[in-house]
Amino acid sequence: MIRTAPHPFSIRAFILATCAAGLSACVGAPGPVGNASVPEPARPVSLAAYLGQWYEYGRYEAPFQKGCEGVTAEYSLRETSGDARIRVINSCYKDGLDGEFDQSTGKAKVVEGSDGAKLKVSFFGPFYGDYWVLDRGEPGVDGTYPWSIVGEPSGRYLWMLTREAQPDAALKAALEARVRELGYDWSLVRLTQQPPP
């Protein structure tokens, strides 16, 4: 969709991969559908502008992320001859910012014909899940996107990511408005605690 916990990283990574791949029956009940008609991504995505560290501003709570705070995701390029050339490192603190640190490492590949806005992400072997960048901000002076909204076709998963741990009030309001415009139920959003600046 990520300092985030590594996917595949233990059972948590397996759950993430299988849920995202639509195999939730294997790992328990998924969350409620927050968007019955997930739209196609709004704009092309440049991989170069997407790479780097992201902070999770909010999400739809999911079993594999339950209780996670201080969530981050970092994307970088892998040295590989295959198509899964993106490294994903997901990190969080369990049950609070002073909780146990958890990290997972996965890989991702861009879906052909998606203008860079759709990825397939795996944290466990051959299992890949959908990761759609539904919208993102215009590149800043450093050439990177300042925010992104990530979802997938089922409408059960949603993430809002920013480059700053503590986005300002204007960006928070803009993210909420855009999430609503995309058809998501804001009442299901769980805001993520991040460390103060």
Predicted feature residues:
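Bacterial Sec-type N-terminal signal peptides, specifically the leucine/valine-rich hydrophobic h-region
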Residues: 20-23
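A beta-rich soluble binding module of mature secreted/lumenal proteins
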Residues: 2-3, 26-197
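Bacterial N-terminal signal peptides that target proteins for export
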Residues: 2-15
